[in-house]
Amino acid sequence: MIKPVLAGFLAAAAVIGAGMLAGALTHAHGHDYPEARSYAVSDDAMGDVEAALARAGENGKRVIVVMGANWCHDSRALAGWLASERIGALVDDRYELVFVNIGMPQSGDGHNLHIARRFGVDDLPGTPNLLVLSADGALLNRDTATTWRNAASREEDAIYDELAALARKAI
């Protein structure tokens, strides 16, 4: 008698546990933003930025330098938004895009921070950061460059509107 009761209890526990695990996985990976892992380590990140500035000068575009890391969900979300159909079309039309891996600057393990300093951003409080540059290297969004740490929570329209406005901003 105890064996059938124990077997029933174990079966019920397995079903409940599987349901809880499935719910946890859905919650952990179910989100309302696209994701991309675009922050590869480059041997010459500054060279990548310089090349984007040169292309921007030739093509009459601006440059977006996204400074983030693949470990960061907001960095992955921002990379995903920039590759989405609507925002990606704007970026392709108006910008040269460069992703720069910066590690974990908030914990003292930052990389390529000299790139931000070159454009007048001395402190990167976290990831990601989005620098919009003119073709001659002027930082056009000094007031918002380091405010992208909530990229996963931003709405598509808000991201699009900000990038569209920066594409038109007078220098």
Give each language-model segment a name:
Residues 1-41:
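N-terminal targeting signals for export/organelle localization
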Residues 38-59:
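Electrostatic cytochrome c docking/interface patches
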Residues 59-72:
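Short active-site neighborhood of thiol/selenol oxidoreductases, capturing the structured segment around
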Residues 62, 113-133:
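Structural micro-motif
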Residues 70-74, 81, 102-107, 137-139, ...:
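Solvent-exposed loop/turn segments at secondary-structure junctions
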Residues 88-112:
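Thiol-based oxidoreductase modules, predominantly thioredoxin-like and allied folds used
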Residues 124-171:
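Non-catalytic, surface beta->alpha helical segment in thiol-disulfide oxidoreductase systems
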